Curated annotation (Swiss-Prot):
Pfam families hit by this protein: LplA-B_cat
Chain ranges of the BPL/LPL catalytic domain: 48-236
EC number of this enzyme: 2.3.1.181
GO cellular component, one term: cytoplasm
Protein name, UniProt field: Octanoyltransferase
Superkingdom classification of source: Bacteria
Pathway in which this enzyme or protein is active: Protein modification; protein lipoylation via endogenous pathway; protein N(6)-(lipoyl)lysine from octanoyl-[acyl-carrier-protein]: step 1/2
Source organism (scientific name): Rhizobium etli (strain CIAT 652)
Length: 239
């Protein structure tokens, strides 16, 4: 029987001879097509021994479809540009106010365990939120990070309402990861209504600002980096 993600060892620290992960923060909004081209280039270089990279971006409003996307979950196909992508998962939204972290790591230098890598990405988000006194949680049947909403009406099955605050979708090539995670800081939450996010209709979406935290993206980035380093190891600012 497969172990639950909550029971996996979250540490994905590199082997002793590995160099620090480059840390890059994009200025302004990055076109999705540009990001994909850049990721493809970086992944090829990392597979050949280049330094690993985490790239933080914000995108203009758009929807992406993962490899498991159901066409019926694209509720408003003409609202924003839609991009098919090779990452895992279903439909998701990207836009201003959402921190997207493209995580390009060589798992051969760490642990060649995809489930543990997904759990580790969730753990980075959970630890980031914890630094802001927000309790993020993982669910075995739903990849991503969730926040309980006791102030909202109970669900039809009598359980507490939950909202998704972070989504994950990854792809691997030669054991090098790309795509990554998105954390809702202060996006326009109405923009998610054009899709069924991640194919799950029973739960809503939230953001840090929606939860009552008037945080800036730079504040979140500092905590995200600190959390990343506890799970994946040292980073260095890209020159």
């Amino acid at each position: 029987m497969a172990m639950l993600r909550t029971d996996l060892e979250f540490s994905m620290l590199p082997k002793l001879d590995s160099r620090p992960v480059r840390w890059r923060i994009a200025d302004g909004l990055v076109a999705y097509e540009e990001a994909v081209v850049a990721m493809e280039r970086e992944v090829a270089a990392i597979a050949e021994g280049g330094d690993e990279l985490v790239w933080l971006v914000e995108h203009p409003p758009l929807y992406t479809a993962g490899t498991s996307a159901n066409a019926g979950d694209l509720v408003q196909p003409d609202r924003f540009p839609v991009f098919a992508t090779g990452r895992g998962g279903e439909y998701t939204y990207h836009g201003p106010g959402q921190r997207v972290a493209y995580v390009m790591l060589d798992l051969k230098r760490r642990r060649q365990d995809v489930r543990a890598f997904v759990a580790a990405l969730e753990e980075v988000v959970i630890r980031t939120l914890d630094m802001m006194n927000v309790r993020g949680e993982r669910r075995e049947d739903r990849v991503g990070v969730w926040v309980r909403r006791p102030e909202k009406p109970m669900l039809a099955d009598g359980t507490m309402a939950e909202d998704k605050i972070a989504a994950l979708g990854i792809r691997l090539r030669k054991w090098v990861t790309f795509h990554g995670l998105s954390l809702n800081v202060d996006p326009n939450l109405d923009h998610f209504s054009g899709i069924v996010p991640c194919g799950i209709s029973a739960y809503g979406v939230t953001s840090l600002v929606d939860l009552g935290l008037p945080v800036m993206m730079a504040d979140v980035d500092i905590r995200l980096r600190a959390a990343f380093e506890t799970v994946f190891g040292e980073t260095v600012n890209e020159p």
